[in-house]
């Protein structure tokens, strides 16, 4: 008997983020170098009207989702996670609000958005269209550094 669609869907947003982190960790453990994780929340995006995070507080809801995902991913991989946000203002605000945790913060417009010596995994959170070139550059740089890492070096986790 095949499961119904409702049987395989997550029961909650928290369950969805946990499943996404587990799937990401599984892909990383199998040697995948690039992963894309998309979580669509109808309250934050209306594909019919095109309105994206139109209500007050919507962006903070999204940032909190990225925090939950990254915390779960870090606990599953036990690596150092760098979360790269679209701009330095967001990265600074979240770093201040959340304090020191299991991951560090960066922004797409940083001179050095990640440090291959210190960061095991790079998560680029909600890049905007203006940041596409930076996302491509970060992805390529991280992949090159992972590919040139010495065998047995734990610093081989790429951007998610």
What residue spans do the PLM features occupy?
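Positively charged, amphipathic N-terminal segments that serve as targeting/anchoring signals
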Residues: 2-134, 141-146
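A general structural signal for short secondary-structure junctions and capping/turn motifs
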Residues: 26-27, 150-154
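A short helix->loop->beta-strand "cap" motif at the edges of active sites that frequently abuts
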Residues: 144-147, 154-159
């Amino acid at each position: 008997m095949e499961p119904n669609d409702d049987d395989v869907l997550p029961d909650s947003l928290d369950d969805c983020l946990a499943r996404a982190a587990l799937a990401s960790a599984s892909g990383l453990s199998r040697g995948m170098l690039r992963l894309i994780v998309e979580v669509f929340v109808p309250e934050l995006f209306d594909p019919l009207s095109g309105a994206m995070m139109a209500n007050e507080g919507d962006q903070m809801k999204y940032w909190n989702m990225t925090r939950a995902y990254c915390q779960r991913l870090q606990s599953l991989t036990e690596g150092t996670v760098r979360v790269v946000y679209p701009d330095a203002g967001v990265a600074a605000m979240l770093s201040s609000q959340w304090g020191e945790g299991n991951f560090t913060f960066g922004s797409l417009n940083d001179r050095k958005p990640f440090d291959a010596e210190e960061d095991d995994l790079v998560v680029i959170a909600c890049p905007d269209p203006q940041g596409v070139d930076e996302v491509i550059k970060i992805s390529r740089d991280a992949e090159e550094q992972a590919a040139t890492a010495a065998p047995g070096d734990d610093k081989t986790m790429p951007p998610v």
